[in-house]
Amino acid sequence: MSSNKLPTSKYDLSTYWGRVRHAMDITDPRTLLSTSQDLNSAVKTLEDYGAGKIAQLDETVWHAKKIVDSTLHPDTKEPVFLPFRMSCFVLTNLVVTAGMLQPNLGTAGTVFWQWMNQSVNVAFNSANANKSTQLTLPQMTKSYIYAVSASCGVAIGLNKIVPRMNFLSSSSKAVLGRLTPFAAVASAGVLNVFLMRGEELRQGIDVFDKEGESLGKSKKAAFYAVGETALSRVINASPIMVIPPLVLMRLQKQNWLRTRPKLTIPVNLGLITLTSLIALPLAIGVFPAREKISPFKLEPQFHHLKDKSDQPIVEVEFNRGL
């Protein structure tokens, strides 16, 4: 009985659209309904396919892979805590995002929702990071405090500055006021990723050959991984934090919503949910989760390695994390 090698994805990950379609599988909220029994069955299906007990790569195998990829961490092979799986990203962030987008929050409200947002960010960054290098509890606590302080500082500062921009019209001030949460979220989100994954930058992350064998740790690979993740966070936040408030401003001028103010929050939540579901896979797909790179872009120790066949290694891989 011959063994089978399971492809990394059902889709072509060398293309943006292929990565988006793969991300749609990973972020599909329906996978959250999978039970422990479903997960165990999916793992066994993949093992049976790898062992050659299942000959054909059909939809049953692909569905099993979808459950496994959306539930287990690629490094530890352990289930990610459900609220912080990428398939739960939209649902977990929904309440926090809606809270931050409320107009006229005031200082206390701004601080509270930025604190909530960064707490969720810390949890997602920690749960989905590259696990070859991990933060200690004191390091995580310090990074958490830094990220929360930065986001609150940016948000409060912008809330104070915008009303004082007397050269702007009242409508322009209103638009900037609605976009203040985005500036805070984007800047703090980048800082959060770099702080929560700072140990990866200091120690490096595991780099692998095409057979999955570790070749050692690379700080340069870590910089690529963390930098791309931070950028994807900004790309993801942009439509979510910009489109709903601007559309809502437009809708609030319509008679049907102006005469029914109680519908404002449900409409806002609907806009946020729809935008989030569309934006998340588009943002994740910008960069491959399993990044391939020339060893000559890394440290000298990776430049002239050879594989088991004594052939030069011309491409290495690392897990970027989500």
From Swiss-Prot:
The chain crosses the membrane at residues 143-163, 175-195, 229-249, 269-289. It holds the Pfam family SFXNs. One of its GO terms (molecular function) is monoatomic ion transmembrane transporter activity. Disulfide bonds: none annotated. The keyword Transport applies. It is a multi-pass membrane protein. Coiled coil: none annotated. Mitochondrial amino-acid transporter that mediates transport of serine into mitochondria. This is Sideroflexin fsf1. It comes from Schizosaccharomyces pombe (strain 972 / ATCC 24843). The gene is fsf1.
